[in-house]
Amino acid sequence: MTPAARTQAAIELLDAIILAAREGGAAADTLIARYFAQRRYAGSKDRRAVRDLVYAAIRALGEVPASGRAALLALATDDAALAATFDGSSHGPAPIAA
């Protein structure tokens, strides 16, 4: 996975976690395990990087954010490397609007 694809995967996971939090659904650990069980192509380093991004967003925000993208954009304000992954590439998230 490219860094941008890892960011997109974290956004997708955060969206699922946010929905589950609002509806009293499964825990984040369970959702992460299910997500990667369906995506066997992701290697251990990819899974670790995505998981770390997801938990960093959860720890940093406290409150339930509007979306996974909003959560990672909040992290990207302090992390230039993360902000650079919002490049609009084929498997990455849409670019950050100025």
Each predicted region: which residue ranges?
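Class I Rossmann-like S-adenosyl-L-methionine
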Residues: 1-98
